[in-house]
Amino acid sequence: MKGMAVTRRRFLQTAAALSASVPLHGFGAALTGSTASREPLRQFDYEQVQITGGPFGEQYNAIHKHYLELSNDNLLKVYRQRAGLPAPGEDMGGWYDLNGFVPGHSLGQYISGLARIGASTGDQACHTKVHELVDGFAQTLGPKNESILRPDTNLWICYILDKHFAGMVDASTLSHVSSAKEIANRVLAGAQPLLPAKGRDRIGKKDPPYDETFVMPETLFAAGELTGNPAFQEIAHRYLLDRELFDPLARNDDPFPGQHAYSHAIALSSGAAAYLRGGDVKYKRALENAFTRLTTEQQFSSGGWGPNETFITPHKGELYAALSSTVDHFETPCGSYAATKLARYLMRMTPEPADTRYGDNLERVLYNTILAVRFPDEEGDYPYYSTYSPTAEKVYYQKKWPCCSGTLVQTVADYPLNLYFQTSDGLYVNQYMPSRLQFHHNGAAMEIVQETAFPSEDTVTLRLHTTQPRAFAMRLRIPSWTSGAAILVNGKPLSTRATSGTFVTIQRNWSDGDRVELRLPQQFRTEAIDELYPETIALMRGPVQYVALQPEAGLEKERLRLPAGLKQVGPQRFVDTYEGRDVTFVPLYSVRTERYTTYFSKA
């Protein structure tokens, strides 16, 4: 997916075609219905937003290509083997094989991710692959509708079912696979005898028995809406972790220490789904309190959390201790999936956000965790943990096709959802990256094109194309990390002050060719790892964490004059000189296979 120069002629030529082929919604129409008060901000559809360049576009394109090239026969082989059908293709190894840790576990996630990418890009090859995988999967279910490859162990039933249902929901709604609804019903029917009576919690990384029901209610609610089958909703309510998670969080108690980090963070999405569908404000309070605890007590400067996949006990210096006790600091594709979903849900549930906390943390997580992972290879090697120890490296997980191979494609495929939100009277611009948004408003086809080299540069330009002038409010996120932000509309300064940590509203009658220019100065700052070790610091510039590239051993112990000693030597490349030696600092996301150090000692 390459960036496209947008001209008024091209827009006017394609507006009619877009109207017919892409479901572009108006602001008011998107917010009708009984849930409008619970969801004052709404996501745009995948079809309405495209990533058109920049580092996120590069990664998006690579992930698009990688998953599209996975062999259908390889992916379906374990299911065909279990069904006694001819099973061409190669064994995939690792977690995925019939004798692996969780056989065939991630097929539904691959289907889901490809459907989402296909919806945003319009790539028919993605939809074709989704159709083929769904059809192949359906052929293996047999008369008993068996989708669990090792039912005799009674382990990971919900873990796998959740992925099956996610795949069928997205295959139906995004790739228009007509059979996916009935397949979801068949999968549920076949699995009923295996389902636990209630959600089984897990603590830390203890051995089974337990099951992964944490995000399953979110998926079950969606499957219930898709199929009209009330059994999905009944099980969804049964699996909500009210006693263990949502009730204490709603009281602002802390249930996190010692718990498996990703499982409980992703479970918050189930609470969001319960709130949006049922309206119980307990779940909304729980998510708000959880976000505060995760971002102020649990996270590293990258936005990651959960060393050794376990939430720490706050205020005891455990994040600092983890820098030397482990190299497994954040379960990155899975954890970033949970963190980005949580931030988006809270954006959607918050009327007229008074500050930018959700968008700011979403930005931090995007740049320093999921964008910063190593690209997968063709052999089933995937990123899993991020390491924040001295002289770290980005390495693959020791087993092929792990859980993160599924959440990687889903998280990246969701990039378009992070950028813009709609309200009854306009839209929010929530993230800054090259992109295109298409929508209708009061009968006019509209397109907003975002052009920027951010964060390499400080400026963002939004160009509007429309078939007819229309009035609406455009709200721009002014991040809390910036100072001295400035906004121009058609070359003239906006009279409203661009205050850090707020959304600035531009209310006007928008015409074709209107242009908004935003400048977000990025300055270096340092952040302490926790309150007990304030001299151990990370280096931040804007939303981006900077690391020392190819550092000498022991650099983390030297007292550097950060950020005062930094001198720029290239785009996003800075040097500090210590005892006659140059130390180079670059964004964590730009590191590929080089060694790096993330935390330093304050001079």
Regions found by a protein language model. Give the residues of each.
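N-terminal export signals
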Residues: 2, 10-30
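Low-complexity, Ser/Thr/Pro/Gly-enriched N-terminal "stalk/linker" regions
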Residues: 30-106, 124-148, 178, 185, ...
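Structural helix-adjacent loops and short alpha-helical linkers that scaffold large soluble proteins
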Residues: 39, 46, 53, 118-131, ...
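Glycine- and aromatic-rich loop/turn segments at beta-sheet edges
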Residues: 71, 75-99, 139-155, 190-210, ...
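Well-ordered alpha-helical segments within folded domains of soluble proteins
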Residues: 99-119, 156-173, 208-225, 259-276, ...
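Active-site neighborhood of glycoside hydrolase catalytic domains
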Residues: 223-246, 264-302, 335-338, 342-346
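C-terminal beta-rich recognition modules with glycine/proline-rich loops and embedded aromatic residues
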Residues: 236, 287, 359-463, 499, ...
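Solvent-exposed beta-strand/loop surfaces of large extracellular or lumenal domains
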Residues: 482-507, 526-532
